[in-house]
UniProtKB/Swiss-Prot annotation:
Main location group: cytoplasm
Transcription regulation keyword on record: yes
Organism: Bos taurus (Bovine)
Composition bias type Basic and acidic residues, residue spans: 94-103
Protein name as annotated: Centromere protein U
Annotated region (Disordered), positions in chain: 1-218
Pfam families recorded: CENP-U (PF13097)
Length: 408
């Protein structure tokens, strides 16, 4: 197995991190990169230059990615870190002269090394050379690069004092930030928080008639986000999420006051706002669910009352049904009697009228004999009825007399 260079993978992504235009030193470094004199691995020899062509295929995929844009970028050596720090800090005339001398020394060293290395891709880092195989040319390069090392150490000290919130080892993990507008940004954040709080308080004052205020806030003395308040709520309306949200905000405010990093505060505020929105949404949904359950319980109780009343009415109807049938029968009988009485009254009125007419005729013409025809047959039968009764009575007497004679 061929030994690979002992170098961190993050070093490949640290190039062009600041996004600024490079000087002549960077352009020359892309074609002929100087030797890394600050890194001395155990297994590195001069013969490693011959194996660059073979290792380029294996490591070519790592060079196509963009550098990471976060604070965990690790610089491979102090020279790259000095480039990043130097782009953010104002340089003095002495530092400018030192940079120019270092640029010329690196260009000369790269020209000497280009004779030895014929096939080399742009933006390719060479493997460092150990102390055992150190040539006189390399020692000259090492002596010439010392001014750049001093400059990089000065920039490291300045960056360490300007960013106390970061780690004390800038070569391992350093975030290149601008220290100048930090106070202006913090003041702008304070102003935006104050305006947001004023708008929220104005909204709460404009709606005084509401009994329930799901978003009632109280301001803290420090410049922080509003705090969830439980004093304006009733004891029956307070839920576990309200208590959790109030305690969470108090703890978060105390923790935020202890932190000095602006990035951490921004992340904490973002996390706080997202979590608070979710919790407030959950509280509102739970409150709506409670009101719906209460309304549902009322509707169910009303339905039960109406159902009970319906059962009672059905029982009463079953009890009244026999009486209803009897009343219906009586009603039918009365209707029949009424109809028969109406018919009898009509017949009697007609008969009375007939008798009146007959008496009137007899008074007017008493000598005229009565004549009967088929139309007067009912009147003749009615008049002969007592005669027929007398005949039948006589027949009965005759029959009884015959029986007595036979017995003698």
């Amino acid at each position: 197995d061929r030994p690979r260079p002992a170098r961190l993978s993050h070093a490949r992504f640290s190039k062009n991190h600041s996004g600024r235009t490079h000087s002549m030193k960077d352009k020359a470094g892309r074609k002929h990169r100087p030797l890394d004199v600050f890194d001395f691995p155990d297994h590195s020899q001069l013969s490693s230059f011959s194996r660059l062509g073979e290792n380029e295929k294996d490591e070519e995929s790592y060079e196509t990615f963009d550098p990471p844009l976060h604070s965990t970028a690790i610089y491979a050596d102090e020279e790259e870190f000095s480039k990043q720090c130097g782009s953010h800090l104002p340089s003095t005339p002495q530092e400018k002269e030192a940079k120019r001398s270092s640029d010329t020394s690196e260009i000369e060293a790269s020209e000497n090394e280009s004779v030895k290395i014929s096939a080399k891709k742009p933006r390719r880092k060479l493997k460092p050379i150990s102390d055992e195989s150190e040539s006189p040319e390399e020692s000259d390069v090492r002596r010439k690069v010392k001014p750049t090392e001093n400059i990089s150490t000065q920039h490291e000290a300045v960056s360490a004092t300007a960013l106390p919130g970061l780690s004390e080892k800038p070569a391992e993990a350093v975030t290149p930030q601008k220290t100048g507008p930090q106070s202006a940004e913090s003041s702008a954040e304070k102003a935006t928080l104050a305006t947001e709080h004023q708008l929220e308080t104005q909204k709460n004052k404009m709606l005084p008639g509401k009994r329930k205020k799901p978003r009632s806030y109280t301001t803290d003395t420090s410049d922080c986000a509003p705090v969830w308040c439980l004093k304006e709520k009733k004891a029956s309306e307070i839920m576990e999420l309200d208590v959790f949200l109030s305690a969470f905000e108090n703890i978060l405010l105390e923790y935020e006051q202890k932190i000095d990093s602006r990035v951490c505060k921004a992340a904490i505020n973002k996390f706080h706002s997202n979590l608070k929105e979710e919790l407030i949404k959950m509280v509102q949904e739970i409150q709506m669910l409670k009101t719906l359950k209460r309304k549902n319980a009322k509707i169910i109780s009303n339905i039960e009352k109406k159902r009970q009343r319906l059962i009672e009415v059905q029982d009463e109807l079953l009890q009244v049904e026999p009486e209803l049938k009897q009343l219906q029968i009586k009603y039918e009988e009365l209707q029949e009697r009424k109809a028969s009485l109406r018919k009898a009254a009509y017949f009697l009125s007609n008969l009375k009228q007939l008798h009146q007419d007959y008496s009137d005729v007899q008074e007017e013409e008493p000598s005229v004999k009565e004549t009967y025809d088929s139309s007067s047959l009912p009147a003749l039968l009615f008049k002969a009825r007592p005669l027929l009764g007398a005949e039948h009575h006589l027949q009965n007497i005759n029959y009884q007399l015959e029986n007595l004679l036979d017995q003698k």
